[in-house]
């Protein structure tokens, strides 16, 4: 059943987790409003309380249609709560088919929106430093939102730019200068990461483990061996743009204003491609009312801890630039006075909150929390009951060599290593819904594309028990 949070609010789904806490979906059972709650245990973040404070401070500065909106925060004892928009469309990586990618018009539209968000961030002097599909979320209209500012920093203040020296991010997405130089400019680093995201969208795979000469795939790229994967899967026009983005020398790397002049960037979408009505900011218009977006990835993933660059001090009480603060108040009653002051006990197993079919309801019902659950393609119905489904899943995962741990009732944690020998952890919930069992996989730690590869492998082994029934999702 749903876990009560505070008066009138229930926690109904774990959206993400990381070193210091998790993100939960909270739904108001009276108004049906949804909000993402990032719950940070400050006792687990004793080594970096300033990082949390800086993340809050940066979030307060943000107001853009391609950036997840921040409503506010409050602290209760050792727990810090950040309230953010909920993105019911899930994470971008879920739309990327491993080794295939996505239709080029979709990739172009998402790339346009990514550029709009990054232009906005750089315009107010902020660099994200961990752009990757796991940190790019989609709303109910499939509009892209940049999320997770745990590694973000201010690189320009009062028109004065400072060089950065902290090596942080996620290795396949980091720019080569992070691995080679003591200091570097902020903007080209984010541009490079956007190029890797575009590659993943078009080819369904990452080009290399890291951009260093010790990596054969990266050396092949520098030698222009585009007859190899992933480049041979990419059409010549977007590949020409990638040749300008993924340039080792940051001073020779294309800038965003020039990206916007690129031939492929301005190529009209193919006939028949899904092209929602857009506003001037590049975002589809959506009905008025409470937006539903989420900040999901909590994985602070430093590549290495270099000497501290953070000479600028941040305080959550320091004044921020005026960025339309009134827009934060997305009432009713300012998100119920930021979810009513908060005082509650954390559930021991928050994912168990989805196990009740009464909670999930049926498609079309007026009060239907299932409509609030994040969309995922990594789920399927089975033809069996819960016990038999669990047993088949367990036997299959053990045969495939996965580490298997029952977390709590109807939830298991599966661990393995991916093709890059990095840790990959995902949670599987068996959910009762309308007398059927939904097997729902969620990435907990690791690379999203690798997670999808493993999901498809497991599903393939279970094909005899997978129901042909389509997963019902909220209409968009």
UniProtKB/Swiss-Prot annotation:
Expressed ubiquitously with the most abundant expression in thymus, testis, small intestine and colon. Changing residue 442 to Q: In OZEMA21; pathogenic; results in failure of male and female pronuclei fusion when injected in mouse zygotes; increased kinase activity. Changing residue 317 to A: Abrogates interaction with RAD51. Reduces phosphorylation and impairs activation by hydroxyurea and ionizing radiation. Abrogates nuclear retention upon checkpoint activation. Impairs interaction with FBXO6. It comes from Homo sapiens. It is an enzyme of class 2 (transferase). Residues 391-476 are annotated as: Autoinhibitory region. ATP binds at residues 15-23, 38. Serine/threonine-protein kinase which is required for checkpoint-mediated cell cycle arrest and activation of DNA repair in response to the presence of DNA damage or unreplicated DNA. May also negatively regulate cell cycle progression during unperturbed cell cycles. This regulation is achieved by a number of mechanisms that together help to preserve the integrity of the genome. Recognizes the substrate consensus sequence [R-X-X-S/T]. Binds to and phosphorylates CDC25A, CDC25B and CDC25C. The active site is at 130 (proton acceptor). Signal peptide: none annotated. This is Serine/threonine-protein kinase Chk1. One of its GO terms (molecular function) is histone H3T11 kinase activity. Belongs to the protein kinase superfamily. CAMK Ser/Thr protein kinase family. NIM1 subfamily. It is found in: Nucleus; Chromosome; Cytoplasm; Cytoplasm, Cytoskeleton, Microtubule organizing center, Centrosome. Interacts (phosphorylated by ATR) with RAD51. Interacts with and phosphorylates CLSPN, an adapter protein that regulates the ATR-dependent phosphorylation of CHEK1. Interacts with BRCA1. Interacts with and phosphorylates CDC25A, CDC25B and CDC25C. Interacts with FBXO6, which regulates CHEK1. Interacts with PPM1D, which regulates CHEK1 through dephosphorylation. Interacts with TIMELESS; DNA damage-dependent. Interacts with FEM1B; activates CHEK1 in response to stress. Interacts with TLK1. Interacts with XPO1 and YWHAZ. Interacts with CDK5RAP3; antagonizes CHEK1. Residues 270-327 are annotated as: Disordered. Changing residue 376 to E: In 3RE mutant. Disrupts the folding and/or conformation, allowing increased accessibility to FBXO6 component of SCF-type E3 ubiquitin ligase complex. It is linked to Oocyte/zygote/embryo maturation arrest 21: An autosomal dominant, female infertility disorder characterized by zygote development arrest due to failure of pronuclei fusion. Transmembrane segments: none annotated. The modification Phosphoserine is found at residues 280, 286, 296, 301, 317, 331, 345, 467-468.
């Amino acid at each position: 059943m749903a876990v009560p949070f505070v008066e009138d609010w229930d926690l109904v789904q774990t959206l993400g987790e990381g070193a210091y806490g998790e993100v939960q979906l909270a739904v108001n059972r009276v108004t049906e409003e949804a909000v993402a709650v990032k719950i940070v245990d400050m006792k687990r973040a004793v080594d970096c309380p300033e990082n949390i404070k800086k993340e809050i401070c940066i979030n307060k500065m943000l107001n853009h249609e391609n950036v997840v909106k921040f409503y506010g925060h409050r602290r209760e004892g050792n727990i810090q709560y950040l309230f953010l928009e909920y993105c019911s469309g899930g994470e971008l990586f879920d739309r990327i088919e491993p080794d295939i990618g996505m239709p080029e018009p979709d990739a172009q539209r998402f790339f346009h929106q990514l550029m709009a968000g990054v232009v906005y961030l750089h315009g107010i002097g902020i660099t994200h430093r961990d752009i990757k599909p796991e940190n790019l979320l989609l709303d109910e209209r499939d509009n892209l939102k940049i999320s997770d500012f745990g590694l973000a920093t201010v690189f320009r203040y009062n028109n004065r730019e400072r060089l950065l020296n902290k090596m942080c991010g996620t290795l396949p997405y980091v720019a080569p200068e992070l691995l080679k130089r003591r200091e570097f400019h902020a903007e080209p680093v984010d541009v490079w990461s956007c190029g890797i995201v575009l590659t993943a969208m078009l080819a369904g795979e990452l080009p290399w483990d890291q951009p260093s000469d010790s990596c054969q795939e990266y050396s092949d790229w520098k030698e222009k061996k585009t007859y190899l994967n992933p480049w041979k899967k990419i059409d010549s026009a977007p590949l020409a743009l990638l040749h300008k983005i993924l340039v080792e020398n940051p001073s020779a790397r294309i800038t965003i204003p020039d990206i916007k002049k690129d031939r492929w960037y301005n190529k009209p979408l193919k006939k028949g491609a899904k092209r929602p009505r857009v506003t001037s900011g590049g975002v589809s218009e959506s009905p008025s009312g409470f937006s539903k977006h989420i900040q999901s990835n909590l994985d602070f993933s430093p590549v290495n801890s270099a000497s501290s660059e953070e000479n600028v001090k941040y305080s959550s009480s320091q004044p921020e630039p005026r960025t339309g603060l009134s827009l934060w108040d997305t009432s009713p009653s300012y998100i119920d006075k930021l979810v009513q002051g908060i005082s509650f006990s954390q559930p021991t197993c928050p994912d168990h909150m989805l196990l009740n079919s009464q909670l999930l309801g049926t498609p079309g019902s007026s009060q239907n929390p299932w409509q609030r659950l994040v969309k995922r393609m990594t789920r399927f119905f089975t033809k069996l009951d819960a016990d038999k489904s669990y047993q088949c899943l367990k036997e299959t995962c053990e045969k495939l060599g996965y580490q298997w741990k029952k977390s709590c009732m109807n939830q298991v944690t599966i661990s393995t290593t991916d093709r890059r020998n990095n840790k990959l952890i995902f949670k599987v919930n068996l959910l009762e819904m309308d007398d059927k069992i939904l097997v729902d996989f969620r990435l907990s730690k690791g690379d999203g594309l690798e997670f999808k590869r493993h999901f498809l492998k497991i599903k393939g082994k279970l094909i005899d028990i997978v129901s042909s029934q389509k997963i019902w999702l909220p209409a968009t």
